[in-house]
From Swiss-Prot:
Top-level taxonomic group: Bacteria
Membrane topology: Multi-pass membrane protein
Biological source species: Escherichia coli (strain K12)
Gene3D superfamilies: ABC transporter type 1, transmembrane domain, P-loop containing nucleotide triphosphate hydrolases
One term of GO molecular function: ATP hydrolysis activity
Listed name of the protein: Multidrug resistance-like ATP-binding protein MdlA
Length: 590
């Protein structure tokens, strides 16, 4: 029953719907008490031979009318009750998605995608079923059960009623024990389903890699193991579930046996008429539904309670980064980074130390360094995926922690290392941040990203569907479409996180030239492994082991002893060797 207490906030808000449904349920329960009474009257009237045919037909017509009214009222309360429960599903999913969208990368490191999807679908469905069918079953069984007991006790015989219901306390104890066991086992079954869902999602999104490495059999075996584990845990739930109905039917059978035995003795003794015993047995038949419903309700509610506890656990997780209260001031501003130290949550080793620089509007910053040196961490801090533990980052001389997240991020356009495209047209992917952009604006940024000609060569040009995650496109095309998408936003700060790694040197040079022209008055931050992408930067910082090892422009660093010069010379030599065969072929042709 704790689920109903946990959902009391919703029941209080939708009290009109639920109260209306409950009122109709009470009316229906009262109407259903009439037919057994009528049957008893008719039986006594027929056995005593004082009923006419007209009287019998009148009572039959009364029962038919009651059946029609009950049918109509059941339709109305179902609309009221289930309409309210479906609205709960909408709100739970909206709250859940809003919570997921507020979370930051650290959250998604701890939670698997398949598990998050299972909570949004399967768990919410269980809660909604409990809020609809569970409430209906609870109210219907209580109202009907109490009404029938009152009629049996007051209108027929309280002694026979008490005698026939002796098995009920044992049944209630068994249902409570089974309900508690069901709650725990269902939580385990839902967790297993989440793992299976996660395995499915991972396998489908990585199907190309699986085929490339010939891992189909291995993945099938892993999936089969997860499916078997899920099946076993659901079977454990089914074993508990299967105990409910036998418990109810044994109790009902015992109650009928006691009622027939005790009632027959009372008829022989003259304290009951045959019609009253017939009515009593019909009332006892009406008790079958409340007893079955009670067991079913425990089943539904315990499943819903286990599911809701999983949803609440997710909704209760506070974001690592808290929203600020101040909007970002209008106009272009200076970005000041002053990081004394930053350490990732649940780790001891600092990821960044003593990183300081200032960027004025119109400047371009290049960031380079070996793998794992802290480049992406620095960009994550600028985007406020995490907050600096010691030091701060300021914009317009205001710490980012004081700025509204939405307001700050609206000033950023980011292209990450792994560009993500939606299963939509090329044009819609470019216009993601500006849905009202014109075709001319879309084509303009595509030209700036040097992808316009590639798009025109696609089957339907800008209207070509790119497939899930852009599966129809090459890596370089996906990167350039992502760059075009960022440029269309026309943000004040553009961040490219190794976003040119999949394009050739000539295309890279053209894109950087276009960015330089486009970026007049804007701040551009480029992180790259290929140093040719940084030659036009106003300043370059070389990251090593989480701190700045070198800084300066390209000309200075190319002459200065250190990582930058060594890597630049190596890449120049590598490029020259790659061009050598082509040069030799041209010489032979000459």
């Amino acid at each position: 029953m704790r689920l109903f207490a946990q959902l009391s906030w919703y029941f209080r808000r939708e009290w009109r719907r639920y109260l209306g449904a409950v009122a109709l349920l009470v009316i229906i329960a009262m109407l259903q008490l009439v037919p057994p009474k009528v049957v008893g009257i008719v039986v006594d009237g027929v056995t005593e031979q004082h009923f006419t045919t007209g009287q019998i037909l009148m009572w039959i017509a009364t029962m038919v009318l009651i059946a029609v009214v009950v049918y109509l009222l059941r339709y109305v309360w179902r609309v009221l009750l289930f309409g309210a429960s479906y609205q709960l599903a909408v709100e739970l999913r909206e709250d859940y998605y809003r919570q997921l969208s507020r979370q930051h990368p650290e959250f998604y490191l701890r939670h698997r995608t398949g598990d998050l999807m299972a909570r949004a679908t399967n768990d919410v469905d269980r809660v909604v079923f409990a809020a609809g069918e569970g409430v209906l079953t609870l109210v219907d069984s209580l109202v009907m059960g109490c009404a029938v007991l009152i009629m049996m006790s007051t209108q027929i015989s309280w002694q026979l009623t008490l005698f026939s219901l002796l098995p009920m306390p044992v049944m209630a104890i068994m249902i409570k024990r089974n309900g508690d066991a069901l709650h725990e086992r269902f939580k385990l079954a839902q967790a297993a389903f989440s793992s299976l869902n996660d395995r499915t999602q991972e396998s489908l999104t990585s199907i190309r890699m699986i085929k490339a490495f010939g891992l189909e059999d291995r993945q099938s075996a892993l999936f089969a193991a997860d499916a078997e584990d899920t099946g076993k845990k659901n079977m454990r739930v089914a074993r508990i579930d299967a105990r409910f109905d036998p418990t109810i039917y044994i109790a009902i059978g015992m109650a009928n046996l006691l009622a027939i035995g005790g009632g027959s003795w009372m008829v022989v003794q003259g304290s009951l008429t045959l019609g009253q015993l017939t009515s009593f047995m019909m009332y006892l038949g009406l008790m079958i539904w409340p007893m079955l419903a009670l067991a079913w309700m425990f089943n539904i509610v315990e499943r819903g309670s286990a599911a809701y506890s999983r949803i609440r656990a997710m909704l209760a997780e506070a974001p690592v980064v808290n929203d600020g209260s101040e909007p970002v001031p209008e106009g272009r501003g200076e970005l000041d980074v002053n990081i004394h130290q930053f350490t990732y949550p649940q780790t001891d080793h600092p990821a960044l130390e003593n990183v300081n620089f200032a960027l004025k509007p119109g400047q371009m910053l290049g960031i380079c360094g070996p793998t794992g040196s802290g480049k992406s961490t620095l960009l994550s801090l600028i985007q406020r995926h995490f907050d600096v533990s010691e030091g701060d980052i300021r914009f317009h001389d205001i710490p980012l922690t004081k700025l509204q997240l939405d307001s700050w991020r609206s000033r950023l356009a980011v292209v990450s290392q792994t560009p993500f495209l939606f299963s939509d047209t090329v044009a819609n992917n470019i216009a993601l941040g500006c849905p009202n952009a014109t075709q001319q604006e879309i084509e303009h940024v595509a030209r700036l990203a040097s992808v316009h000609d590639d798009i025109l060569r696609l089957p339907q040009g800008y209207d070509t569907e790119v497939g899930e995650r852009g599966v129809m496109l090459s890596g370089g095309q996906k990167q350039r479409i992502s760059i075009a998408r960022a440029l269309l936003v026309n943000a004040e700060i553009l961040i490219l996180d190794d976003a040119l790694s999949a394009v050739d040197g000539r295309t890279e040079h053209q894109i950087l030239h276009n960015l330089r022209q486009w970026g007049q008055g804007r701040t551009v931050i480029i992180s790259a492994h290929r140093l040719s992408a940084l030659t036009e930067a106003s300043e370059i910082i070389v990251m090593q082991h989480g701190h700045i090892a070198q800084r300066g422009n390209h000309d200075v660093l190319a002459q200065q002893s250190g990582w930058y010069r060594d890597m630049y010379r190596y890449q120049q030599l590598e490029a020259a060797l790659d061009d050598a065969p082509e040069n030799r072929e041209e010489a032979v042709d000459a």
